[in-house]
Amino acid sequence: MHLLFALAVAALPSVLRMDDALRIFREGGFDLLIADAQVAAAQGDAAAAGAIANPQLSGSAGRSFGYDATACPGCSATAWSVGLTDPGALSDLLTGKRGLRLDVARAAVAAARLSRDDALRALSLQVRQALLDGALQQAQLDLAREIAESTDQTRALNQRRMQAGAISEAELARAEVAALEAQQGVDLAEQAVRAGRLQIAFLLGSREPAADFTVDPSLLDRPMPAEAPPLDALAREALERRPDLLAASAQESRAEAGLSLARRQRVPDVALSAQYQEEGSGQNALQPPTVTFGIQVPVPLFYQQQGEIGRAQAEIRAQRATVEKLRAQALVDVQSARAAVDANRRLVDRMRARLLERARRTRDLVQIQYEKGAASLLELLDAQRVWAQTRAEYLKDLHDFWLAVFQLDAAVGRS
């Protein structure tokens, strides 16, 4: 993905659906762009690890004083030399150190790519949760407006009754307080909706976040999916495809390659050189044409890479422990998410089966009774409170159910 394309501001649709949000996030989410840059950095490290050291070319020139170069044929007072040195490239290839460095770097690239996939998994869950929160906040705003409208109608009815002398001012005051409190709830719900939309826009990579869109309301109240597969099947899927676990395995491979490289570093690097020099060319020249070959080998007399080897061995142990920790964490995540899905499914089913309908029916009946004078204002307010509480609880149960579904997807490695 070209950087300019990735940085382009994605226009949010007027009604933001889940698929659209995930697509926009994958194209330009801030954290995903950072993860892409980390992969590119690892690829750069791999290119550097495979680099072959450049040979070194040297040359020098000088002049001898107090020497008569004309006294003999071929003599010269000018000295010059040229040399070529291999700082260890040939030795690097023959000893296999370059190949081992490449193994380490390639494993690091694989780990970076898998870490990017894991970032996509975790961040996709954040996007889904943010959209669920936005849908819940919109539904709560609709509920708050419904309550405000109902309480305002009750206030207006009581206003007419008091003018007719049918009720006292105290009862009207109660109705007015209920209406004002309901309007307070509307204002708070509107603020929550706006804040939630701004957070969604930020997560999706908007450079100038705005709240001029609506979250798809069907994200909450829609048919529930079929029962999840058995727990053992979900656990196997998580262990096979979770990118954080695969990335940890790649890091373990990188650590093992690093240990092999540390051990191979005990083989001394050999530097080769060749030099040609002359100061004159005759038999009496100060320095007749001379070719010199050299070799330089460090003698590992006092230090044989013990520190690097010990560090590499410790890193292998740490990476293996990390793999085991992530395996256990993956199984915990799967079991917790599956339990949450099942529990919230039962709550939603119970709400849909009877509880929600009975709370609404009770509110409607008491409303009719109050309008006919057969119920008190306190009974009406209590019925409205129970209905609002039940409806709000139902919306929260729906939110928690779908969040648990998305968490289960993330737990098994789906993004």
List each language-model region with its residue ranges.
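Sec-dependent N-terminal signal peptides
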Residues: H2-A10
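Cleaved targeting-peptide boundary
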Residues: A10-D19
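Small/polar, glycine/serine/threonine/aspartate-rich low-complexity segments that form flexible
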Residues: L12, S58-R101, P217-A228, S260, ...
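Periplasmic alpha-helical coiled-coil/stalk elements that build and connect Gram-negative outer-membrane
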Residues: L16, R116-E237, A340, N344, ...
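Amphipathic alpha-helical coiled-coil scaffold segments and their short linker/junction regions
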Residues: D19-G28, V82, S91, I167, ...
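A glycine-/polar-enriched beta->alpha junction
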Residues: R23-L33, A40-P55, D68, G83-V104, ...
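Amphipathic alpha-helical coiled-coil segments
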Residues: I34-A49, A119, L123-R145, Q153-A156, ...
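Short, charged, amphipathic alpha-helical segments
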Residues: R106, E169-A178, L377-R385
